[in-house]
Amino acid sequence: MAAAVLSNKGATVKGLEIRVSSSGTSGWHIGQGAHPTSQLVWEKAGYQHHHVASQFKANDYFVNDYILVMDSSNYENVLALASCEADRAKVFYLRSFDPALHHIDPNSGDYFKLEVPDPYNQSEDAYREVLAMIESAVDGFIERVIQDRDA
């Protein structure tokens, strides 16, 4: 869902090119499409996106400027694949870009407040709540990308 939001919102910013890829840290769903409820919710919100699941690999550090994770398990798994400090510096919780949460240190005891809950097989309302979290964070992330580009 985050990839759908980021790719669509990023495409609306003139002069900004954001290429989005989405992957998990396990191989459970490699090659599968998005969960039907997730896709339904993002399409109802006006986002278009085609998703095929893939697994995060250490090589992804070489082709991405930012690595955004949804939860602490993914945060730890992605950091474990980092080969250097420059790789680790690319890793962020997506919600750390939410203006209401940007003050939270991901290495503090409050890290859990930065997690995006997985609504898998829950109600459509749960997916909509997650979409709202993602939208707020993506807006903040796009602002950060623009700041970094203009620095």
What are these regions (language model features)?
Residues 1-64, 143-150:
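Conserved active-site segments centered on acidic
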Residues 72, 77-151:
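Phosphate-binding/catalytic loops
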